[in-house]
């Protein structure tokens, strides 16, 4: 075999390996979505069976998210040394163990632990696939990250349809659906050779990666992690502040850099972005249940429908990115999402499907395009900056977003029921509870079952109004994002337009 033939064979092998890695990563994201969508389908069954309040259900959504951020940050710090393949073995173990624990759960804490473990696996998957794909496609990162993240809505569609078609079967069988994509990505990725991350290839030192994120970036991540873990384990505020201070001061002493201000700004924007997309996704089934039931359609189909829109559009993201630029695409998406959420909160009947379509278009490009902007602007940050933006987004939903939506509903139900029927209010409200947002009194599910059908209808009407209020509140967030992206667009326009930063090989210098 001559040299040219040998080179062609070698390239073919590389292309084949890249295909297996990319689509294996895609299926791994499908697995993360399966766990999420099934939770939205069975959360109301959990509420009835285990007498959960709306805020407790919100906390279960939250614990499906914040440990994700914990694992994605920790693996980002060590994954280049540990190895991407070993990290995926850990993710596989988490997905398998979490399903078993959840299926065997006997109450709130069993569900909580099972959901916590699946979130660790999900974070590990993202810690691996984002830098791997950014490295494989260095000249078109935003496009390929969008295609990769079509796996998320794709998993929502497939997992959601399977769960809905299973009908009223035991929720444990629906939870077991995650075994399907987990087995597939395990077979596709185990034993594969992962590429060396572009920062490492270019010889950019580990400390420089930490300096790109900087003190300000780590301050946000640490504050969100410590506040949520402190809430879960009932740590006093003094302990939370002390632990957070030790972590941030230790990081400061080592890196001695504030970090990139644009990265800090993008971290702040990621908080409303993630709450708009994931926070609303978490509740979309329950939020739209009253209206969809009047049409004779299970509300879970709304999330499946909007996810189908996302999946299709992400596969064809290239023209949108090239026409509008990543920041332009994010600005337009923010406006469309805001209009869609307002429409969802006001629409009734068939019009709700049109509103859901608008919302689906709006949220489609948020997450992967934000990752693309970070990958293109901060390549020296390697796996850390790329995954820290995802961590902050996920933490903000786990700590703030999902629990906040539940709190809005519980507080609205409390206030409206007290005004409409004070006697009923005293009969069916549970003891006062405390969340991160303050005190509230949830409905007692056991007492609710004992009242008359007429009284139950009163409660259902109030609950429906509370769900609409939650959607209207979320609509404020993409408006905030639109302002932020407009500022960045003007900044780049003053510098000649948006351009991806080029990573020079540090090993060839001086």
What name fits each language-model region?
Residues 147-244:
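Helix-loop-helix hairpin linking two adjacent transmembrane segments in secondary transporters
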Residues 51, 83, 104-109, 138, ...:
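Helix-breaking motifs and short loop linkers at transmembrane-helix boundaries and internal kinks
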Residues 59-77, 304-317:
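Central cavity-lining transmembrane alpha-helices of secondary-active solute carriers
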Residues 140-163, 386-409:
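Glycine-rich segments within core transmembrane alpha-helices of 12-TM secondary carriers
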Residues 17-54, 126, 130, 280-288, ...:
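Extracytoplasmic
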Residues 404-475, 510:
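Low-complexity, proline/glycine-enriched hydrophobic segments characteristic of transmembrane helices
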Residues 70-109:
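Conserved MFS/SLC helix-loop-helix module at the cytosolic interface between two early adjacent transmembrane helices
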Residues 39-41, 214-242, 251-304, 398-408:
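Extracytoplasmic gate region of multi-pass secondary transporters
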